[in-house]
Structure formats: C-alpha cells, structure tokens
C-alpha cells in the first residue's frame, strides 16, 4: 500500500514537472515569485531574527520593565479585541437579523473610522474627553484623565470595531436561512435558536474578526503613543529603543517578541477553523425564504445600541472637521482657513502618501491575482509554501515588517533606506495577503472548465490568464485596489521606521504634529487625507 502511494506521488510530481517544462512562461513566473519571496520576505525576516544576540534576549527576558510592557501589550490587546468583537457582532446582527430603521445610515457611519488613521480616534478622544476636553472640561467641568489603559481601550475599541463588523457581517449575510427556519419549525426559538444555530454558523466570522482585531491592536502604534501615557506597550517601546535609546538590537528583540502573540493567534485561528466544519450543504436556496429576525424588544435594544455607537463615531469625525476649521477649538470658534493654508504648505506629504498608496495598491492587486492564479489553478512543487509565504505578513505587526526592511536594505546592492521604494515595499508586504485572499475568493467562484477549454484550444497559461481570468475578476480587482489604497493611506506602524525627511507621509506627519501640539494642522491633514479615501 505504501509503495503504491509513493508511486502515485512520484508520478504526480513527475507530471507536474513535465507541465512546467512544457510551459516556460509558467515556470519562469513560479521561479520569479519564489525569488521575490526569498529576497523581500524570507531574507528581511531572517535578518531581524539574527540581529539580537543571546545577551539581548536575556536582557529583555530578565528585565522587569520588559515583563511589564509585555503584560500591558497582551492585556490591552485582549480587552480591546473582546469589546470590538462584541460591538461588531451586535452591530452586524442588528443590520442582518432585524427590521430596524436607519440601516443604511448605520452601515455608512460604521465604515467612517476606516477612512482615517487609527490614531485619529485617540486624538478625537483627547479633544472631547481629555483633561481640557470639550465635553469633560468645557461642558461638565470635570477633571478626567484619559491617558492610560482606559483611554487606550476605548480608542482601540472604536478604531478597530469596523474591522470586526465588516468581517462578521459578511459571514452572517452568507448564512442560508434554511437551517434557521428548519430549527424554528422543530421548536427552537429565541435565545436557544440564536445560540445553537446562528452563533455556531457565525463562528468563522468571529474567529476571523478576532484575528484581524487582535493583530491590529497588538501592532497599533499611534493610539498607545498618544493616549497610552505611561502605559507602555511593545510597539511603542520598540520604536523608543531604536529612535530614542539608539539600541537597535533591543528594538529588534522587542519586535520579535511582538510577533509571538500574533503568530499564536494566527495559527490557533487557522487550526480551529480547519478542525471544525461550518459548511452547510443545502443545494440551491428555496426562493421566497425570509430570514428569521429578532423580536421587537431585541430589535429596539439593537437599534439603540447602533445609534449610540454611530453617534460616538460621528462625534469623532465631527471634532476632526470642527478643529480644522476653528481658530482654537474649545475657546475660540471663529471660522478660519489658516490651518488649511499650513496644510497646503505641507502638501508634499499628502502627495507622497498618494503616490506610495497608489503604487502599493497596484502592486498588491497585480501580484495578488498572479499568486492566486498560480496557487489555485496550477499544480507545482512548493505550491503550499507559496501560499504560506503570501499569507505570512498578515500575522506580523507593522513595526516588525518596517524594522526588518530597514535592517535588510540598509546597505549593499539593494540599499533603499530613505527612499520611496522602501516605503512602497513595506506597505506592499503588509497589504499583499488581503489582495491575495480577495483574488483567491474571486477565482473560486469561476468555473475552472472555462480555463480548461482555453487550454484545449491551444492557449498557454499566460494567454488564458490574460484573456479569460482577468476580465472575469474585474470586481475583485477593483475591491482589492481600493482597500489597499485606503489602508496604505492610513498606515502608521509599518512605515514609522521607513520614512525620512525627504519622503515623509501624511499619517506620520499627523502623529508628529499631534505630539508637538499642532493639532489643528494635523486635523486638517486628516480631513485632506479622508478626501482622497472618499473619492
């Protein structure tokens, strides 16, 4: 039995190699992808692992400050992730499982935080609820200190709630009403139906949302820097070690430690979803079926929750706009355009952000569809490795990627430090997994027989890809491009080590202005940046 299996495997491998040899363009494409991954993923990540010495590891592990910072990072990430997922699920459930009014309004407002850097949430909360906040000090005359774990928790919850909502809502939408209606016909009602059917089928969405929010909160740099106060986390501490203490080995050590919890979350999520099946094989859905909806009381409570959350988001967006157009928000509300003039004088950072984001979106979209075509439609040795390397950056914090780029390309033939190229490279690595998975999802919806017919008519893989696959993936390509552009415009942690005086970005400039006290100009650039996102 084992000999037969080995023979089949040998035959399969031999057949795959013969196909590659018959199609030189396909073979060259696969080798080129592995070469790109070796140079721009494996080499930089190996480089950052080799920088710290044994003494650096011991210095970090045995230091009381490190233990405190590591604990702070895990704790703040867990509570922010938990509340963001709860908020995201309740919001998504209200949108998809109730007949409440204002759904369209809620959907639009929930996406607004994604159109600005996450640091904007922290800035807005300082302006509204800080020591001299508009609500706490100006209106209520209260002395409130938001700096610390509480303020960081609130800021990260609001900043990353949209990620949880989008992910969970997509899964809830895809759940066929057949099973819920069948359970209802068998006597399941209310909480029991929700717990045993709906919640279980939504588990993939919850797991994916947990992964996205946990990684983003672990790697969050702007909010801990502005709102954290003396509550230090690994992302900000690594930055401080590199730029403040000039201790590059310790910065690399802390960045590697930041990867550990994100990789654990990544692999646990994948293992859990692969171990359990959530597929519902029901054939074609019966026409006319209406989804089971929540009762009047639950609908009312969910509507109130969605409205309060949307009002909080609108307050954040509103204070950004008002601050940019008023002389001194909280003291002098005279209309002014002075800060926009200052923003225009610094318009080069907006242009840099736009150019880098456009290039990143184009690279990740094209490379993502090419990778998806190879891993989904072609059989070749190393296909699983290619898929793993394409998805690896999604589990890595932005500060780790940025520092790895600096260490790898600081000298030698591929020296890129201080250039636009290294910024685009770092952002492209960060966004590649999203473009890749979007293309994979699109390809899986296309019948493979269409490409087989093209091959039977004499077309090679490149011609089939160009004339058959690409035209049918227009929607996936456009979604991938827009998402990569928006996320790149707002990225912070990935590029914090990559920018230079010659090539600065708007997101970095906003945080720098806020740290220096030039909040109005920073708000103005947030406003201008959002204009690009909303185009």
Task: Write out the residue ranges for each language-model feature.
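The alpha-helix within a helix-turn-helix
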Residues: 183-184, 454
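Peri-membrane helix termini and adjoining interfacial loops of integral membrane proteins
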Residues: 7-10, 48-59, 128-140, 227-235, ...
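Glycine-rich helix-loop "coupling/hinge" segments at transmembrane-helix boundaries
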Residues: 221-245, 332-333, 492-519
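Alpha-helical transmembrane segments of integral membrane proteins
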Residues: 267-304
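Short, Lys/Arg-rich, polar N-terminal cytosolic tail immediately upstream
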Residues: 1-22
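Membrane-water interface segments at the C-terminal ends of transmembrane alpha-helices
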Residues: 21-55, 64-173, 199-222, 253-270, ...
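Helix-loop-helix hairpin linking two adjacent transmembrane segments in secondary transporters
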Residues: 236-261
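A short amphipathic helical element positioned immediately N-terminal to and/or at the very start
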Residues: 14-20, 55-62, 335-344
